[in-house]
Amino acid sequence: MKPHRHQNKNLTLCGNYSLVIALMASKTEPLPVAEQRRMTGRLLVGLEDMAKSANPGLDSWRDLADCMNWLESAVEMGWVDDADGAVEAAKAALLDGHSNANKHGKLRMSGPSLVGMRNMVEQFGELLQVMTARNYWTVVGTGEKRVSAIWRGKKKAGDVVVTL
């Protein structure tokens, strides 16, 4: 059966921002536990794929990049403190995977890069448990606007665009 154009294909890890979703989200409760587990599980599978798979998939890399972009948006908004540099470590790890893809044809990450990504995934999981659903969706919307601005050519210092 042919899929319809209007079907939601949950391609992004964090979901697609909608004002209605953001307004309907709880101001006091975090995201449902099932949704938190889905996201962190998807990230852990992606991390495992990057570490052990013979040919790591592009979806795993995208999920990890979505997580990094979400965390970077939360830090820019001032809602998350990144004293340990998890965002920069994750950005360096993603660039490491990209350079390995250019050199060897595989999205492989080195050991230190995997440690940086694991720290980012753990921080993301902890934030999902304490951040309200409304704040989560606000960060998603801000992140989408930030990425859209980058694609339009409005880069800030530290922004990196990688195409695979």
Annotate each predicted stretch with a short phrase:
Residues 1-3, 50, 98, 158:
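Compositionally biased, intrinsically disordered low-complexity regions used as flexible
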Residues 1-17:
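Short Lys/Arg-rich cationic patches that frequently serve as NLS/NoLS or arginine-rich RNA/DNA-binding motifs
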Residues 13-17, 32-43, 59-67, 110-116:
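Short amphipathic alpha-helical heptad-repeat segments
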Residues 20-55, 81-108:
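Short, flexible domain-boundary/linker segments around small modular repeats
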Residues 44, 48, 65-68, 72, ...:
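Residue-level detector of alpha-helical secondary structure
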Residues 55-76, 107-127:
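Extracellular/lumenal glycan-associated surfaces
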Residues 78-84, 131-136:
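HEAT/armadillo-like alpha-solenoid scaffolds in large eukaryotic assembly and transport factors
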Residues 101-164:
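Amphipathic alpha-helical binding modules
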